[in-house]
Amino acid sequence: MLALQSPELDLLGVTTVAGNFSVEQATVDALRLLEIAGRDDLKVYRGANMPLLHEKSEYAATRHGQWWSDAPPTTPPGGFARRTAEPLAAVQFLIDVVNAHPGEVTIMAIGPMTNVAMALRQE
């Protein structure tokens, strides 16, 4: 939340990934959080829906995967955001933004690194 309000940071976008919750839940939550914070200028890009190294059944059985499922996302506090995620995939967004600003982008990954790993694999 502090980063969203910081004048020192130039946030370029938000990517989501499956982690403690499904990527769908992470995406609707990110959209709602940005709306509450008054940051509708930031686009949200849906990311990886599975970890790279585990099967779905293994992942769902872990402590952090206990809430992860194919169920539709639950309604965030205050309802769903008025907008939706961008059609561009998170991995492609990361590749595009880093290539557009070489040496200037710092990725602040606060969840699983799956999107970053997939972007590195592709480039």
Task: Give each language-model segment a name.
Residues 1-123:
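N-terminal acidic, glycine/proline-rich low-complexity segments
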